[in-house]
Structure formats: structure tokens, C-alpha cells
Amino acid sequence: MRIFPGNFGQRVFLKHSLLQFVGLFCVCCFLIISCGRSTSVNSPNSNTDASRVTIGTTLKIRTIDPADAYETLSAQLFYNLGDRLYAYESGSTKLIPQLATALPKISDDGLTYTIPIRQGVSFHDGTVFNAAAMVFSLDRFIKNSGRPSFLLGDLVDSVKATGEYELTIKLKKSFAAFSSLLTFPNLCAISPKVYEIGDGKFKPDTFVGTGPYQLTKYGSDSLKLDVFDKYWGEKPSNPGVNLQLLSSPVNLFNSFRTGAVDVAYLSLDPEQIRNLEKGAKEEKWYAIASQSNTVNYMVLNQKSKPLDQLEVRQAIALMIHRPLMNERVLLGQALPLYSLVPTTFSELYQPVFKDKYGDANFAQAKELLTKAGFSPTNPAKVEIWYPTGSGRRALVAQLLKALAKRHLDGLLQIEIQTVESATLYKDLEKGVYQSVLVDWYADFFDADNYIQPFLECTKGSVSGGCEKGASQGQGSFFYSEKANQLIDKERQEINPKKRQEIFAKLQTILADEVPYIPLWQDRDYTFSQKAITGVILEPTQSFLFSPIRKQ
């Protein structure tokens, strides 16, 4: 997920917070877990069926209202409880119809999308699905002003049912990746009889959609999903899923090793992953690994001294030692990254930071710091912040501090700071932090979602930085009129080769100006017991429960 509703600061808060695995909050969760409230819904399926699948995770859930949710776990639930107009073919990034019956018909000016709607679909409460129900779902997503509402609100002019089973969407301006955006998990159909439209009118513990599973229990420590027997599509391979929300990676690790959970899904620490991989090689269980699209990076606040000086930002970029970081901190479980666009976009990814700065280029870093006026008696002082409880980022910050101390002759002095994640993301847009270590999980599978949220600024200047817009919300306050123009151009360009050229220019700007420093790209790890088959991590990072079978 990413960060930004109408107010960009809220966007940042959510996008990043959903990717932080644990914090001091987890201690509190452990203490109150037995007191958690739960909501149950009647279901014909048995609660004690031995073939049900139990999935354990440390991911947190705040709400399951698709108009307001913006966390990783809620997104995965929507993939399994709901359907969208479009999805991706399993095992690929090919766009296929889901609640639509064909790809959209797009007008010559790129502003009007006409979409045929599937017939014979029912919601979990028995309400019939049609174009009017899809209009309701998309309108509510925009008008209820939840955290992800900007995704459609900034782009869509109107959504109308132009037939009982035909939908017409008009855009404010053309966007080449709009069809991909419609795969965003929160843009699922929801029952008009259960939900209502209105600013802030959310149902945080309710979900009534059209997907293969229906929610029958919602609690602070567990959720229960039963198969929807009237589902229009292929039926799941299991009778239902029990989702256990565990308070820490240690609890997830131990629960899996003792067999209390069938599948361990996000997030484990590197040492725990290495231990479980060893067990998989000994055939105790299965390990499923895939290249993730999540990027990890360092934000540099250009309004904060000394990071307002380009030479200082470039010196930090020169100092970064990604191979060592991957070896020592991440235990080889990641991929060194040299752009904000992940390597999975092979035709668009440009390793611009490798070409311009390399790794561990300490001599040139010292030259730039000296040129900027710093010395051992007058060092550049930079604070590196990270969310409390992020063990990996704590170690990365310590590594960067050690590299500066050992190799930069006192020219750069790094101080490590940590703060609770909710506070960090709330204050990011206020310019409170000099630099921050964070990550990004995209909303939809298009390279635009790794560039526009970082480099675009709707109001600002080169001298004053970004006053309103994406880069302000990210905490870099980067402003470039050229970048703004290129982003607007790539969003409207439908020719793949021309779009590729534009993305190359944008990545060059990223490397030249250094508002962010890409560090690594995650690999996702999931582990399953030997009685479990069908666990698949999709290239788009969706985790579907339907194929999982317990023998």
C-alpha cells in the first residue's frame, strides 16, 4: 500500500506503517490479546473442520473497510474476500477481467473507460451484483474520504452505470496505468445494503463482498474465513481459513515450529528465516521464497541542514555499501537496489545509483564533504531515524554510522534516533526528521507507483522545496518542475518505448538530486507444514488462500 489520501501526510502514515512488522506496540498486544473483541457471523461451515488451514502472521489490522484500510494485511484479506473489476493472471502480471468480462474500451482521448460487467454474481448477503453496485462501491471509496481515497479521487471525474451490466468511468485527465490501478485490492465490490456513502462512515469490523471467502469472525487476535458456497468462480481447495494474528516474529517462529500454524506468512527476522530454511532443506517443512516488489530506501530531507546541500546528500549516497548491508544485516535475503523502481520492472529499471555512485566510494565522499565546507572539527551532522521495533533498520542505521566513523575521517557524524511508527509517519510531512529509513509496497503493479509518489510536487519551488504534494508527504520536500512535467507526460503516454525513455530520465533526476537513496529490494518468505500444498506467492505480491490444501 502506499501513503497518501487527500491530505498527503495521512497517505505517508498509512503506506509505510502497514509495512512495519513489529514495535513496542507488540508488547502491549501480547498483554491484551486475551481481551480482544471479536465479531462473529453465522456460517454453515464447521468451526472444527480438521482440513481448515491456519495461517499465522505478525501483520497488524486496523480496519477491514476497503474505503479506509491501507495496510498490508487488509489488502491480502480483500484479495480473498472480494473481487475487483480486474486482477492478474496467476503466476504472471497479465491483466485479466474479474468482475468485468473484458478489458475496458478506452476512448481515443484516454478519458473514458467503458467496462462490461459480469452477470450471475451475488454478494455474501445475497444481494445481486450489477453495474449499479459497482458504481456504489467506487463512489463510496472516493466520497467516504478514507486514507486511500486519493487513488481514485485525484483521477476520476465520474462513475456511472450506462446499462444494467455496463460501467463507464470518466477521468479528469488520461492515465496510461488506469486499468492496472483498477486491480488495487480495495476497489472491490461491496454490498450496497450493508454499507453507506458519507464522509467517515466506515465499518471497520465488517466485510460483505463477492469473493470466494466470507468473513465469519473478526477479532483482535484472529479472523475466520469460510468458503462462500454461492461464489461465481472457482471454489477454494480448502473449507476455510483461520488467520492468527501473532504479536511478534518470535511467536510466529515458535508457533510454526510447534505446528500451531500451518503457514507462516510475514514477518520473520533474517536469523529466523535462515533457521527455517535449514529445516526445509532437512525436509521438516516447505520454504516458499519469491522476489518482492517492496523497496527499502533512505529519505533525505532537503529542507534540513546540512542535507540542503547537494554535496552532502551525494556524499551519503557514495558511502552506502549495499553488498555489505545485504551480507551482514539481511543475511543475503535481499537484493541490492540502485533505483526506486524495483528490478521486477526489468525494462524500466535503471541502476542509476550504481552507475553514478557505486558502493563504498569513501574517497569521493570525503572530497564532496570537504568541498561543502566540512572538516573533522566541523563535521556534517546527520540524524538517521527509523520506526521503533524495526530490527533490520536498527542494524542498517548502525552499519551506516560505523561506515562513516571508520572511513570518512570525522567529516560526517551520524546520530541514530528511533520513534514509534505512528508518530514518525504523522510527522514526516512536517519536516521533523533529517533522514529516515523506510520501505514502500506499491498500490498497483506499474512503475508509476514507484516514481510519482516520491518525486511529484503540486506546489513549491526549487529554493523553498515542496510545500504540497507527494514529496512533502514522503519527507524529502523535493521539488523539480522538470520531474513534474515528465511525470505528467509518462502518465499519459501509452507507447511503451516512449514511456520507458521518460522513466529513464526520471530515474536520472533521482540520482542527480538524491532526495532518496535506494538500499535494497525485499525477498518474501513463507513457510508451510508438509501437509500443506498450494502456497503461492504471486509476482504482484498477492497471497491467495484458495489454492491452499491441507492433506
Positions of predicted regions on the chain:
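Extracellular/periplasmic solute-recognition and catalytic clefts
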Residues: 158-160, 216-224, 242-304, 327
